[in-house]
């Protein structure tokens, strides 16, 4: 039954591929999401806000900006930047008139800020889109103040059910990110989040279908397409809110892992990196 539903949904999409932009792969307000997806969104900013008390904060690749307001509760100033015009317009419209929040169109490879401008930089689910991540790390180091912090998270490519995002260039493991960051003058701590739970029979079927879909490039390319697929297999979804809030999902804090450890049993990796 699940296989039939999946193929009936996906084959027409593959016959009618369209050009996509970053907005179409952004977890934007109003898109249906599972409880775990909402928890992941909430966890990102709940984790980051601990570093933001009284600080100047920059979120690079902020998408539609759902996290900016949450960070601004503690931060002195929050700047959100994204390369996608639609994302920037959405965030600007929502935060219009909000004190302490600024939204800019920026390129992560060439950040338009003076040296030593920020205490905290956040980069969530975006490093794998960058053509030259080393340029971003160089720029991040340049604009961070002494003892500044870079907080990152990424889908875990070592998880067996990992599915690469459209437009992605290169995914990095936790170990690879730590090694890369340390080449650019950071001291990095790897963490992992969302351990894989024991699978039910239904979960096993969905997992098999997902792996087949990934192998043959049949996974929908847009967030809206993925939303429809989730409805088929998972039923009712909840809408992603325009601003992160404490009631939207469970907080599952990332856990420290040993350096050099391969991470097969978690869906998400985090890195907390500090300027040497």
Segments and roles (model prediction):
Residues 2-110, 137, 251-252, 262-273:
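Conserved N-terminal segment of class I S-adenosyl-L-methionine
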Residues 14, 151, 196-276:
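A C-terminal cap/extension of S-adenosyl-L-methionine-dependent methyltransferases
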Residues 109-120:
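A short acidic, Gly/Pro-enriched loop at the edge of an enzyme's catalytic core
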Residues 123-126:
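A short beta-strand submotif of the Rossmann-like class I SAM-dependent methyltransferase core
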Residues 134-146:
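A short glycine-rich, Lys/Arg-flanked "PGG" loop and its adjoining helix->strand segment in the class I
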Residues 148-154:
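Conserved beta-strand signature within the Rossmann-like core of class I S-adenosyl-L-methionine
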Residues 161-180:
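Acceptor-substrate binding/catalytic loop of class I
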Residues 186-197:
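Conserved S-adenosyl-L-methionine
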